[in-house]
Structure formats: C-alpha cells, structure tokens
C-alpha cells in the first residue's frame, strides 16, 4: 500500500525539516507539503501545494492526493509569526478545525499527528515544577498560545472519538522560537 503523508506548515523551519526527512524515508512514497506561502528553505522531495488550512478546500487536497497520514505542524506559538494574535488564533484553532473536518470526511486518512505543546500544562506558581502526561494543570490556560493548544487538543480528542479507525498522536514538545 502506498504511503502518502501530508505535512502542514512546511514554510516554517520544523514543518519543512520534517517534510524533507519524511521524503527521504523509503517507507514513504510521497510527501505533500502545504502552506500559504512557498518555503524559503529547501524542501526537495516534497510536493508543495499552496493552500490555507483555514479553507475547507484542504479536503480536496487530502482526497486528490490519497493522503493516508496527516501531520499538522501549522500550530504557531508566537503571534508575530502569524501577523498578530487574531490571525494566530485563526490559524491555530480554526485551521485545525478545518483540517480535522477534512480528515473526518476522508476515506483514505488512517493516521493523524497534531503538534501540540508543553504549554498546555500551564505555568502558574501553583503548578508543580515537573509534569507527567497523566497530570492535569491546576488551572486551564486562559489566553494566548497555551489556550489555543488546549482547545486544539480538545478538538483532536473529539475527532478521535468520531473516527476510532484513525490512529491519533498529540506530541507535546517544549516550545522554542527557533522551531516555529
């Protein structure tokens, strides 16, 4: 069976790097990279498609390419990378919702990876210094990027309930500006 991976956010460093590495993997037949602007860096081996994940047209990209794995890297930690807080929220939350809707309708998607963040744990003075995956923050994030990723995770959990046939992964890396 052919393996076709769609990676969002390929114009930024981490998304582009991942797409390039996946394209070099012999178990992956094709990598489709999606973003609103063409990458300034090399993504050789990746088929670039200019598309906005906030638009329902992303479903056409997934279906026409026969994508079986979606890796959503287009979650922006810093408002300046998005043009301000409002566009950041739209890209992060609305974009993820549209992408999940497209994956839900898809007949080919079998795996979904959505980049989350350790920011979802919060960082109040009452929180412990170290968290485990099983722990919950004392207070849910109330604003900014941390709230975005908490909302995103909630939508992804809902997707996983509706599509139990799709394997879902939510990695929570520690954020660094260089990884946007």
List PLM regions with ranges.
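Conserved glycine-rich Rossmann-like NAD(P)H-binding loop of the short-chain dehydrogenase/reductase
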Residues: 27-36
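Conserved Rossmann-fold NAD(P)-dependent oxidoreductase catalytic core, especially the SDR/UDP-sugar
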Residues: 97-145, 169
């Amino acid at each position: 069976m052919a393996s076709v991976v769609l990676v969002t956010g390929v114009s930024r460093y981490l998304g582009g790097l991942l797409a390039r590495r996946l394209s070099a993997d012999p178990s992956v037949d094709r990598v489709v990279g999606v973003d609103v602007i063409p990458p300034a860096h090399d993504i050789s081996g990746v088929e670039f498609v200019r598309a906005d994940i906030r638009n329902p047209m992303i479903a056409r990209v997934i279906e026409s390419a026969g994508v079986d794995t979606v890796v959503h890297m287009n979650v922006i930690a810093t408002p300046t990378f998005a043009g301000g807080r409002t566009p950041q929220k739209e890209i992060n939350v609305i974009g993820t919702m549209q992408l999940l809707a497209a994956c839900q309708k898809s007949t080919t998607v079998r795996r979904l990876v959505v980049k989350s963040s350790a920011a979802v744990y919060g960082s109040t003075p009452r929180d412990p210094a170290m968290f485990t995956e099983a722990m919950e923050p004392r207070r849910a994030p109330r604003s900014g990027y941390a709230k975005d990723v908490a909302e995103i995770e909630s939508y992804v959990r809902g997707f996983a309930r509706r599509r139990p046939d799709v394997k879902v992964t939510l990695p929570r890396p520690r954020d660094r500006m260089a990884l946007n």
